[in-house]
Regions:
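Cysteine-centered catalytic environments shared across enzyme families
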Residues: 1-319
Length: 319
């Protein structure tokens, strides 16, 4: 759980390093292992780091290519970054770290926005193209990583949390009544609205190019992925579905076990976290699991039925 932040003044006004730092400091809890800043006149990028892959200073962000044309601030985890790194190295790219953020950076340099079709994982990042003076923004397919933004006049401001955006003096603290209505109706917000007027959630499975422009102050997003539930013309035998689900599930779990720090699993008594634990424990014996519970001394019979601690404890002993 790292954090990103940034300011892009589309009218060419210089970004205040003090303001950028203040924004990034508000989300320091997301990245206790380091901070970094990049400013170049009208563009500023901030980062708070939670080190998981490559714990060395070489993986410090914001990170630039050797030519300094591209600069990235990235929050995420790429599960296929080792394969992509090998592919990019074969194409002539040289890496300065072992991080997945640098792989995302050079993947964009090599393939542009088409790199998103190759990234397997969850992420939210911004890449500044110094030559074209254009900011590239992208978010993972399911919107796992948070990415908020606002456009106030010529000021484009983004961050991993809304409170960082509120630090900017041009952003007003106003309730979005439509967002509030949506939340009270559905107990969730399914559009790009938030509870704060003017602050939007960058859509999942999407990207955007934002060029320096003193005239046009609009962000147009493009969808690069969406769900496809199309049924096959001829259904396969049931056993084939079982075997394919088993293969894909094991692949998904094993891909996420790459880390330079100790891994753990939130374990409930359900079959989802239990199944993940069973697969992960085959590669990482005695993996640590964590289960949360509440004092149920005065709980009703119905409430006691939701307590899964006993089942979770049993599963933790198994693995």
């Amino acid at each position: 759980m790292s954090a990103i932040s940034g300011i892009f003044n589309l009218n060419g006004e210089a970004v205040s390093p003090v303001l950028l730092r203040r924004m990034t400091d508000t989300i320091a809890h997301r990245g206790p292992d380091g901070e970094g800043f990049y400013t170049d006149s009208f563009i500023g990028l901030g980062h708070r780091r939670l080190a998981i892959i490559d714990l060395s200073p070489a993986a410090h962000q914001p990170m630039a290519t050797k030519s300094n044309q591209f600069v990235i601030t990235y929050n995420g985890a790429l599960y296929n970054f080792l394969q992509l790194r090998a592919e990019l190295a074969a194409l002539g790219h040289e890496f300065s770290s072992q991080s997945d953020a640098e792989v995302a950076l050079y993947a964009y340099k090599q393939w542009g926005e088409k790199c998103l079709d190759r990234l397997n994982g969850h992420f939210a990042f911004a890449i500044w193209d110094k030559t074209r003076q254009t900011l590239f923004l992208a978010r993972d397919r399911y919107g796992v990583k948070p990415f908020y933004y606002t456009l106030v006049g010529p000021h484009f401001i983004f961050a991993s949390e809304q409170k960082a955006i509120l630090t900017h003096p041009e952003v007003k603290r106003e309730i979005d009544l439509e967002g509030l209505l949506e939340y009270f109706t559905f107990q969730n917000i399914f559009t790009d609205r938030t509870l704060l007027k003017g602050i939007r959630l960058f859509p999942p499975g999407s990207y955007a190019f934002l060029p320096l422009s003193p005239i046009s102050h609009q962000l147009r997003t493009t969808r690069y992925w969406d769900f496809n539930f199309q049924e096959p013309a001829t259904p396969a035998p049931r056993q084939e579905y079982i075997e394919e689900l088993d293969r894909l599930f094991r692949q998904a779990v094993n891909r996420q076990l790459v880390s330079n720090v100790e891994l753990g699993i939130y374990l409930s008594g359900g079959m989802d976290s239990g199944s993940i634990t069973a697969i992960a424990a085959r590669r990482l014996p005695y993996i640590k699991t964590f289960t949360c519970g509440f004092d149920l001394h005065s709980a009703s019979g119905l409430e006691l039925g939701f307590d899964e601690r006993e089942k979770a404890e049993y599963m933790s002993y198994l693995f």
